Amino acid sequence: MNRVLYPGTFDPITKGHGDLVERASRLFDHVIIAVAASPKKNPLFPLEQRVELAREVTKHLPNVEVVGFSTLLAHFAKEQNANVFLRGLRAVSDFEYEFQLANMNRQLAPDVESLFLTPSERYSFISSTLVREIAALGGDITKFVHPAVADALTLRFKK
C-alpha cells in the first residue's frame, strides 16, 4: 500500500493545498496530511485548529487522514508507515529549499521517497502567508480558501 505524507504548517490550509491533496488522493492509496506544530514560525492558529480546518477541507476524501505532529518529520513518517513525502512546488524559487529538504530527508529516512507536485495554474500564486496578510487587512480571501477557513480567519482578525 502506498502511503503518502503531505507535511506542512497549513497556517491556514489553502485551495492550493487542497488541490494537491485531491490529486494525491487519486494517485495514492492513503494520504496523510501531516500538520506540523511549527512553534518557531509562530503560527496564527493553534495546531488543533489547523488540524480541524484541514479535516473540514478534506472530509469528502475517504482516503485522506489529517494528523498533527511535533516530532522530526522522518520519525513521524516511520510512525505512520509512509513511503512517500509529498511536497508542492509553486515556482522555481521553491525548488532550491525543497531540493535540500528532500536530500536531508533521504539521509534521515532512506526508505521514504520525495515526490513534488505543482499546483493547478489557478492556485499557483496562493500562499498561506499572502492569505493571512489579505485577511488581516480586511480583504476578500474567499477565492483562496475553503469557506470554513475564511470564517476562521475573519473571526481571528475581528479580535
Curated annotation (Swiss-Prot):
What residues bind substrate, as annotated?
T9, K41, L73, R87
> What sort of enzyme, by top EC class, is this?
transferase
Q: Does the keyword Transferase apply?
A: yes
Record-annotated site: Transition state stabilizer: H17
Which pathway does the UniProt entry assign to this protein? Cofactor biosynthesis; coenzyme A biosynthesis; CoA from (R)-pantothenate: step 4/5
Family annotation (InterPro entries):
Cyt_trans-like, PPAT, Rossmann-like_a/b/a_fold
GO CC entries: cytoplasm
GO MF assignments: ATP binding; pantetheine-phosphate adenylyltransferase activity
What are the BP-aspect GO terms?
coenzyme A biosynthetic process
Question: Which residues are listed for ATP binding in this entry?
Answer: T9, F10, H17, G88, L89, R90, E98, Y123, S124, F125, I126, S127, S128, T129
Annotated EC: 2.7.7.3
How this chain assembles, per its entry, is:
Homohexamer.
Q: What does this protein do?
A: Reversibly transfers an adenylyl group from ATP to 4'-phosphopantetheine, yielding dephospho-CoA (dPCoA) and pyrophosphate.
Q: Which NCBIfam families match?
A: coaD_prev_kdtB, cyt_tran_rel
| HAMAP family listed in its UniProt record | PPAT_bact
Protein name (database record) = Phosphopantetheine adenylyltransferase
- Which organism is this protein's natural source? Pseudomonas fluorescens (strain SBW25)
- Gene from which the chain derives: coaD
